[in-house]
Amino acid sequence: MKNLFIGVDFSKEKVDVAIIFADGLTETAARVFNEFKTTVSGYKQLVKWVEQNSCGIDSSLWLFCGENTGDYSKGLCNFLYGKGYDMWLENAKSIKDASGLRRLKSDRADASMIAEYAMRNYDKAIMYEPLSESLAQLRELFLYRQMVVRHRCSFQVRRGEKRLTMEKSPIKTMISQSGRHIVSELNKEVEKIDKRIAELIKSDEELTEVFTIVTSVPGIGTQNAVCLMVYTDNFRRFNYDSRKIACYYGIAPFGNDSGTSVHSDPRVHYMANRQIKAMLTQAALAAVNFNPVMARYYMRLVERGKKKQVALNNVKNKLVHLVTAMVRNRQTFTPEYKISA
């Protein structure tokens, strides 16, 4: 049981902090507030301030909590983890939805709301653990590659539009040549990133093992494998639970029933990481074409009357369940794997 809950509201240049003293769900003292810079010295001042205002409560009974804001939250979380403090990094929407109607919006109020959320939902807390150094580097490379590919696609589309809409002129020629050069350079950059990703995976024994297992499934290529590894912390983030991974990917169907008048067939929810969901769609399409096991499964569903998009989503689910089980059991794919309908 924790008795000191520290809510942290992250921003680019500072963090706002609120402390709640509690015995169970009962607050035992007035809340205290402060703000600190997002620097190592600022983090040290934060911890020192909490110690001074902890009323003698041992640090093992503290719980820091904040919204997952990506890079903004990473610095303090890694600092607290390195010092041995418990840090809970929660989804921002979960905190907002659980906090009810709020009229006041300020950094201080947000920090207070986060601290209260931590107090009331302590039993759901998942303590923060940073990615391994190799996996963190792999994540940065993967995200950088995604950005470069988006820019390349943007220039390719732009060049195509100009080719169709502009009359021949020196300006059109200049734009076309410049665009061609930029696309060529971006292609070289993608190749460089792919080479670095391969070197990084090869240099780490665990990454090599998991990557080999995942890519042994026909239809799952390098980028889908890296995507799975990065977003699931080598499948440990969800404790090898394929249902949770499918939910995170946005491919798990959910029903909508209420009383006697509201009823709809289960369907996937809009809340998902759409970028990685699109990548899994590509993997499913490749699996249907090149993986005999998945192809037979897909055709059985279509023959039963399933719509093709529904059948394809089922293939995505099967891929996630299959890959998760293979990584958990440390086994590579063989055609003898049985996929139940």
Q: Where are each of the predicted segments found?
A:
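Gly/Thr-rich phosphate-binding beta-strand-loop-beta motif of the actin/hexokinase/Hsp70
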Residues: 2-22, 114
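Nucleic-acid-processing active sites and adjacent nucleic-acid-binding tracks
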Residues: 24-63
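Short, solvent-exposed helix-loop connector elements
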Residues: 54, 127-140, 167, 264-267, ...
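Acidic, metal-coordinating catalytic cores used for nucleic-acid/nucleotide bond scission
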Residues: 62-75
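Anion (oxyanion) recognition and catalysis
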Residues: 81
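Long, charge-rich intrinsically disordered scaffolds of nucleic-acid metabolism proteins
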Residues: 88, 92-213
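Phosphate-backbone recognition surface of nucleic-acid-processing proteins
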Residues: 216, 222, 226-304, 308
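Low-complexity, acidic/Ser/Thr- and charged residue-rich accessory regions of DNA metabolism proteins
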Residues: 260-261, 297-341
